[in-house]
Amino acid sequence: MTRRILLLILLSLFAACLLSCTPQTTVPIGTVNFTRPGESRQDTLLLFLPGLRDNSGVYADEGFVAAAGRSGIKADMIGVDAHLAYYLEKKFLKRLKEDVIDPAKRKGYRKIWLVGISLGGFGALWYDIENPGDLTGIVALSPYLGDPEMVDEVSRAGGLAAWHPLAGGDLDDQHRIWRGLKSYERRESCAGRVYLGYGLQDKFATPDGMLAAVLPPEQVFTIEGGHHWPVWRTLWDDMLKSRVFDKDGKD
């Protein structure tokens, strides 16, 4: 009992420290426009969601924006400052929709894609699950998909296809998200619009692999490597070469 109490105290202190080090949420959520001044607006918009310790400008810093430009893709690109506090305070979905995606639609964007790494990949999948039909598609690189207990539950069941959430009662957030991921078993919900990439030695390779198993194989990109930017840059280049953003959300 004493050890359990000590563990709870340590977890509380860790959470308090994490919150104190995390930027505050704002209304509207912050963004950074990667489009060069004077360039005409495109019909396609790529929205980049940062990872746990990153900021909205990281995709420019790490070469993603430049690589997209070199690929010839015709798209405007915006980084969204969706840091950890938005998730912890349960503001992520509301702020992304009301401050970024709905205004983008009003401006006339015909195709809107979310691109996210790690925590951002989780955010992209979560938004797509909770707002069906809002997005043209998503790219999730090494997405975080929940705590080890949740992942173990799905794994013990034999994977996402064999796993079923308990019937009756309210599901917690993690079970709701995995139930949403399970919906990608239906080809019409993911074909040509849900793309997954991860390193085979990534710390999230097990849950990402279970998601990969229900997606069309041509929409899954893997290489050797771990949870690092060099891996993600290579996966991004591979996806750009495959012209994933030309699919228009169709296979």
What are these regions (language model features)?
Residues 17-20:
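C-terminal motif of bacterial Sec signal peptides marking the signal peptidase cleavage site
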Residues 22-251:
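Non-catalytic cap/lid and distal C-terminal segments of serine-dependent acyl enzymes
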